[in-house]
């Protein structure tokens, strides 16, 4: 059980770190220009970097962009406050998950039953991680439905007739965080199941004295 919890926390840590640094939180597989769908034009972006490929009529043109730079220049599709909050809650969740990972590692070599270094700690750090990652997901969804679905293009690209309205979907980097949240429920569920089994009253066998006879 302890080894499984350790592996699970390593998995959660890997999922969240991968989701944090990869550039596929959102993806637009095709864009419109003056009402015409351009399958060779696309956009994908993460929390830090992204890529735009636009067909201006002379072939596709690649452009890598920094989310931070576009936010500071006030031309990006992310709100600065919401962007900071998303990163903050993911970082906070990683902190709680790291503590949970260390506690799980400790439990593979030591038995701590009634402190936060034992199973109760697994509940605590898992719940704190879930709350932090869920807050990040909620804030990002707020940004997604309020602005990202409407536009992920720059002002000059909009002026040129490009449009990404209702063509942007959540991509795999986002779902890695969702998968990490789901994974955190597994050790908690197993602990609940294990505790329920341990708390069941055990039937005691009463020895029978065969020398005593009832008449």
Predicted feature descriptions by range:
Residues 22-85, 162:
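A surface-exposed beta-alpha-beta supersecondary segment
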Residues 119-122, 160-170, 209-212:
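Juxtamembrane helix-loop boundaries in multi-pass membrane proteins
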Residues 54, 86, 90, 164-185:
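Hydrophobic alpha-helical transmembrane segments
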Residues 202-215:
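Non-transmembrane, juxtamembrane loop and terminal tail segments
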Residues 27-41, 147-160, 201-204:
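Interhelical loop segments of eukaryotic multi-pass membrane proteins
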Residues 61-72, 154-162, 183-195:
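Alpha-helical membrane-embedding segments
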Residues 135-171:
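Juxtamembrane loop segments immediately following a transmembrane helix
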Residues 1-30, 83-143, 180, 184-196:
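Signature of small four-pass
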């Amino acid at each position: 059980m302890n080894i499984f919890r350790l592996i699970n926390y390593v998995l959660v840590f890997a999922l969240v770190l991968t989701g944090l640094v990869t550039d596929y939180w959102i993806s637009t597989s095709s864009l419109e220009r003056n009402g015409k769908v351009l399958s060779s034009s696309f956009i994908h972006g993460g929390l830090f970097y992204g890529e735009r490929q636009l067909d201006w009529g002379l072939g596709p043109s690649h452009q890598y962009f920094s989310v931070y730079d576009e936010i500071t220049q006030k031309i990006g599709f992310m709100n600065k406050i919401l962007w900071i909050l998303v990163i903050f809650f993911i970082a906070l969740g990683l902190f709680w998950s790291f503590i949970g990972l260390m506690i799980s590692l400790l439990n593979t070599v030591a038995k701590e039953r009634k402190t936060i270094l034992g199973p109760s700690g697994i509940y605590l750090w898992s719940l704190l991680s879930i709350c932090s990652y869920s807050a990040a997901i909620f804030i990002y969804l707020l940004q997604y439905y309020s602005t990202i679905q409407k536009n992920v293009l720059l002002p000059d690209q909009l002026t040129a007739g490009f449009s990404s309205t209702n063509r942007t979907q959540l991509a795999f980097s986002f779902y890695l965080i969702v998968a990490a949240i789901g994974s955190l429920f597994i050790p908690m569920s197993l602990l609940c199941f294990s505790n329920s089994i341990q708390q069941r009253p055990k039937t005691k066998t009463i020895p029978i004295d065969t020398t005593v006879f009832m008449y």
